[in-house]
Amino acid sequence: MKKKFIALFSVLLLTSSLFLSSCSLPGLGGSSKDTIRIGAMATTESQIVSNILKELIEHDTGLKVEIVNNLGSTIVQHQAMLNGDVDITATRYTGTDLVGPLGEEAIKDPEKALAAVKKGFEERFHQTWFDSYGFANTYVFMVRQDTAKKYNLNTVSDMRKVENELTAGVDNSWMEREGDGYKAFSKAYDIEFKKIFPMQIGLIYTALKNNQMDVALGYSTDGRIPTYNLKLLKDDKKFFPPYDASALATDEILKKHPELKTTINKLKGKISTEEMQKLNYEADGKLKEPSIVAQEFLQKNNYFEGKN
């Protein structure tokens, strides 16, 4: 399976390389050499974090920063950095990059996974992987508070004793995923739900809230989790690999502007999963622009009190 994945990743990487070489994505190719270019995916989370970095770097260093938007995947982000089209990518995830660009096996221990990507990206790509912001965006099982109380559910293992009574809503793709999909999960936890409802991930949270199922599998930083007062069940067997979020920068840009390292490190451990949920909801639920959400986060946490 690992060989198949690496082969597939290589094909996708070549395709994205040819694409990026033949045409410019929005924001690519027209920047001044004195401008710091931050790559961001189209997700709300990536948009918010990239704006946090932009505002903080401009405030602390006086450097001009632009965001290169809508880099559609880890593969595209990776190739954009290799091509020199961006200097920093705002949201990189340990589990994704470990098995993607590095082509390694998944590592379940978060600290070991972080150490592996730091070492791998420095040695192979001359890029610096920063410490985690403090949040991980991973798969997580969740239930309503009434369900948790009724069945005394705190961990994923707790579901085993009532598996025949629980219906579950899950992401369509999760049913077929190798390694961390339903078959592997069922084997690891010895759990088979009464009934499973595969559906689009965006529909799961509301369906759970509206009592259409008892359990749902979603993403840990989704803003609807606190809004709907859902309870997250601890992955006590550490089945899902860690997806801790960090910034990634080229060694070249850090050598040219060493002050960037100090500024980026200010965010180490400063954005918890709960905080990221709230920030995502500010944008998705309250329809605020990610740039506004970023500014409000920095102001609230007094990041603008230092250099100017």
From Swiss-Prot:
Gene coding for it: opuCC
Record organism: Listeria monocytogenes serotype 1/2a (strain 10403S)
Keywords: Cell membrane, Lipoprotein, Membrane, Palmitate, Signal, Stress response, Transport
Name of the protein this chain belongs to: Carnitine transport binding protein OpuCC
Task performed by this protein: Part of the ABC transporter complex OpuCABCD involved in carnitine uptake. Involved, with BetL and GbuABC, in osmoprotection and cryoprotection of Listeria. Can also mediate weak glycine betaine transport.
Signal peptide: 1-22
Regions annotated as coiled coil: none
Single GO cellular component term: ATP-binding cassette (ABC) transporter complex
An MF annotation (GO) of this entry: transmembrane transporter activity
Membrane topology: Lipid-anchor
Compartments it resides in: Cell membrane
Pfam family, one: OpuAC
Lipidation (S-diacylglycerol cysteine): C23
Stimuli inducing this protein: The complex is induced by either hyperosmotic stress or by low temperature. Osmotic induction is sigma B-dependent.
Covalent lipidation (N-palmitoyl cysteine), chain numbering: C23
Location (main, coarse): membrane
Family membership noted in the UniProt record: Belongs to the OsmX family.
Assembly mode: The complex is composed of two ATP-binding proteins (OpuCA), two transmembrane proteins (OpuCB and OpuCD) and a solute-binding protein (OpuCC).
